[in-house]
């Protein structure tokens, strides 16, 4: 545990002191937001002290450091998490109580940081927690997005995107390091020539300089003084305001250069369906990579006087393809700024970079137009050309005279730069994020690369920060668990397995059911307050919360809900286990089908809630602005976890793990980490349906799948789609959605992700869910078995595997 012991009295004094010094007010006059900031400052002081200790230890021991680059870190609120990890949560709660404040109210003052979007960013945040707790010398790097992804509002059933001004409460957790500001060069012209000694000289001029200003967020570990650091880069213009233009009234022109530079850190994932959006995204990626590498290299050189030992002291881990430019940028720094030969620079680079792939979707394996890369980073493009040239020569040794194969595997081809291919060529390790996903990478996505570089490929199944998602989010369940097995699982999550011994303990199972009901009530209260919908507490809380994408098949869930509505309308007195279907997701602003799907969910919700014949048995709720703090309410309350992507498309998933750890039962395909959840709990404790990966892939490849035949022969599906065409009583036409399922669109096949094909199997699995739910003893037993076997999905385990098998660094974690 932390060396420092925090007492109620000391914390009261510290908070009162912060209120006086920062707000010039006494406790009795302070507002909740002032008290929140005072608490945050007190906690941050402790974090800063530990961060300095950690940095001093890193300097002294000289061990290999991990640098984790990701475009997003969905960290969630910091106050409670840090107070919990530091061991001060109880004392802080008591201190605030004495001062007339409820801790829960103070927590609510903190906005969720807008630094991430979905699973990729949440995984990165969980891994920072794991690194800090496991004692891995790790630093995360990303961009300090001023407005984050976006704040979602639902207006007349439709998603509206608003700026997410999270910094008003999030800035307190960030420590600026102005003295470590770096300059990133965008655009310009490169002249190269060989001097009299045969050395390549690079002259880079007429570029646009952008300052990268670092802000550090300390990330606490549990029960340790070790701190991981998340360094966020803010873009600023170094060019002074043109006062002459400003004074003459040309205000916009005077500010133009400032604005162009600062847009880089304005918004996460700007739309890229136009050239300007593509340009901004690529600038963001290069800005992150260049600032980060300059930072690491400058500090390394200051300590060792050379970069020749760089690979022995650093691992650059790129989380998905977005930071892949780290490979040519490191080459640039080593050659152009440190006079290394190509061979020496490549040897260092290819021993320093590790790559995690997170997708098998072709459209997500990033490709950039050569012309755009050339325009924004001309020297980097030269280096990419050279990497490609040498790589293709290497490929020729494996596939002599097979020009088609080499073109297929090349880094640069068809006027595009293939980032995944660049990542594979320049990394010493390539890992998938579930056992199934890693096999798909080897057997289908990167088959030929695997034949050449089989030793590079490995698997590390994703994991979640179990202390946040169980210990903090579900305190009643934690109290029950710890009454039986103690607290060891907090740092050794595999100890949750001991709960298997209580699978037939009727008293414990009943208590588990009571706790679930309490958590359901909390979510029901939230739904009533935010959606105005009364939900049946005796209904099954069936939840699908995740990024909205066609492959995740929210549509399959919707089709089933409409079919249940029809059943109840036909037979209002049927024996029916009530259901509350809960959705939460954001659609990318330019993803029309996803946005229309959100509107469809809300149309169905309104129709059902206005129908007295069914509304006590069936409910549909869409929770707007899904984020970490909302997930912390949803996960403990969920009873059914919808993990229904078409098999072979979901790399892993982590929501499935959070639900499992909180006692929800999974209904899902054999996809991603669902496969490993099924192995962990046994097929009798999960509801599996649908095609498996080989069948789904074979059907797609054959071209023989005909959704129209299913529509014509299945009266249930026909009725569902016909209603979609005719509408749900609110005047909105969903013919376009039905046509996508039956006829295809946008160049894609009909029902691309085969929702109609898996519908019957899914509906049958949902019938099994209802039948088991009637027997609460059996249901609670299955829930306990899921909780007991969830420890293998802790981020601590994932980080330890990365440390041992990929990064080759020390860890405190014991398997």
PLM segments and residue spans:
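A conserved ligand/cofactor-binding region detector
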Residues: 1-815
């Amino acid at each position: 545990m932390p060396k420092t012991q925090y007492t109620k009295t000391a914390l009261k004094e510290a908070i009162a002191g912060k209120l006086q010094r920062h707000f010039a007010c006494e406790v009795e006059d302070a507002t909740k937001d002032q008290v929140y900031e005072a608490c945050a400052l007190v906690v941050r002081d402790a974090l800063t002290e530990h961060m300095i200790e950690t940095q001093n230890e890193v300097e002294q021991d000289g061990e290999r450091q991990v640098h984790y680059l990701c475009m997003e870190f969905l960290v969630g609120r910091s106050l409670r998490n840090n107070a919990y990890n530091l061991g001060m949560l109880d004392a802080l709660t008591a201190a605030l109580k004495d001062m007339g404040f409820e801790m829960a109210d103070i927590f609510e003052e903190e906005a969720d940081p807008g630094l991430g979007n979905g699973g990729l960013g949440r995984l990165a945040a969980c891994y920072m927690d794991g690194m800090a707790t496991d004692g891995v010398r790790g630093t995360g790097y990303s961009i300090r997005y001023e407005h984050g992804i976006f704040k979602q509002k639902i207006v007349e059933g439709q998603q509206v995107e608003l700026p997410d001004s999270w910094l008003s409460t999030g800035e307190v957790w960030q420590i600026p390091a102005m003295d470590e500001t770096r300059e990133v060069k965008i655009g310009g012209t490169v002249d190269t020539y060989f001097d009299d000694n045969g050395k390549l000289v690079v002259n880079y001029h007429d570029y646009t300089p952008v300052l990268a200003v670092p802000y550090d967020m300390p990330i606490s570990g549990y029960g340790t003084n070790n701190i991981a650091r998340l360094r966020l880069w803010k873009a600023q213009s170094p060019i002074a305001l043109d006062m002459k233009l400003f004074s003459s009234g040309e205000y916009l022109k005077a500010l133009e250069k400032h604005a162009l530079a600062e847009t880089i850190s304005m918004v996460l994932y700007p739309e890229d369906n136009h050239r300007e959006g593509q340009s901004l995204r690529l600038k963001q990626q290069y800005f992150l990579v260049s600032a980060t590498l300059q930072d690491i290299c400058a500090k390394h050189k200051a300590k060792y006087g050379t970069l020749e030992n760089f690979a022995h002291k650093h691992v650059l881990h790129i989380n998905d393809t977005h930071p892949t430019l780290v490979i040519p940028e490191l080459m640039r720094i080593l050659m152009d700024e440190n006079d290394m030969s190509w061979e020496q620079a490549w040897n260092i680079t290819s021993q320093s970079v590790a790559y995690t792939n997170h997708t098998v979707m072709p459209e997500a394996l990033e490709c950039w137009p050569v012309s755009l890369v050339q325009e924004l980073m001309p020297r980097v493009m030269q280096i990419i050309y050279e990497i490609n040239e040498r790589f293709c020569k290497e490929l020729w040794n494996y596939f002599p005279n097979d020009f088609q194969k080499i073109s297929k595997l090349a880094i640069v081809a068809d006027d595009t730069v293939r980032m995944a291919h660049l990542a594979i060529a320049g990394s010493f390790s390539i890992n998938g994020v579930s056992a199934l996903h890693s096999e798909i990478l080897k057997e289908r996505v990167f088959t030929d690369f695997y034949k050449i570089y089989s030793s590079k490929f490995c698997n590390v199944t994703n994991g979640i920060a179990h202390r946040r998602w169980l210990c903090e989010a579900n305190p009643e369940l934690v109290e029950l668990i710890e009454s039986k097995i103690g607290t060891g699982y907090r740092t050794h999550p595999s100890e949750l397995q001991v709960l298997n011994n209580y699978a037939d303990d009727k008293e414990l199972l009943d208590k588990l059911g009571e706790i679930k009901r309490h958590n359901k009530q909390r979510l029901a209260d939230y739904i009533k307050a935010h959606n105005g919908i009364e939900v049946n507490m005796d209904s099954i809380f069936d939840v699908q919360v995740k990024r909205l994408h066609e492959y995740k098949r929210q549509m399959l869930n919707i089709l089933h809900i409409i079919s249940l509505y029809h059943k109840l309308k036909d037979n209002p007195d049927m024996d029916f286990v009530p259901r509350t279907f809960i959705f939460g997701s954001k659609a990318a602003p330019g993803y029309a089908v996803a946005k229309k799907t959100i509107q469809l969910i809300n149309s169905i919700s309104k129709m059902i809630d206005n129908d007295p014949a069914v509304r006590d048995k069936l409910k549909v709720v869409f929770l707007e602005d899904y984020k970490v703090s909302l997930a912390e309410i949803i996960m403990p309350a969920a009873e059914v976890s919808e993990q229904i992507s078409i098999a072979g498309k979901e790399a892993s998933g982590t929501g499935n793990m959070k639900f499992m750890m909180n006692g929800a039962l999974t209904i899902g395909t054999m996809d991603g980490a669902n496969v490993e959840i099924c192995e962990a709990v046994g097929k009798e404790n999960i509801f599996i349906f649908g095609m498996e990966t080989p069948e789904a892939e074979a059907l797609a490849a054959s071209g023989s799948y005909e959704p129209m035949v299913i529509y014509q022969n299945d009266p249930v599906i026909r009725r569902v789609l016909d209603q979609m065409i005719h509408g749900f009583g609110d005047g909105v036409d969903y013919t376009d959605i039905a046509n996508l399922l039956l006829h295809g669109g946008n160049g894609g096949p009909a029902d691309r992700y085969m929702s109609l094909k898996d519908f019957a199997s899914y509906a049958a699995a949902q019938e099994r869910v209802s039948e088991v739910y009637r027997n609460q003893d059996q249901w609670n037993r299955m829930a306990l078995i899921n909780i007991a076997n969830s420890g293998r999905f802790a981020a601590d385990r994932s980080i330890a595997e990365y440390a041992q098998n990929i990064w080759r660094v020390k860890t405190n974690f014991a398997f």
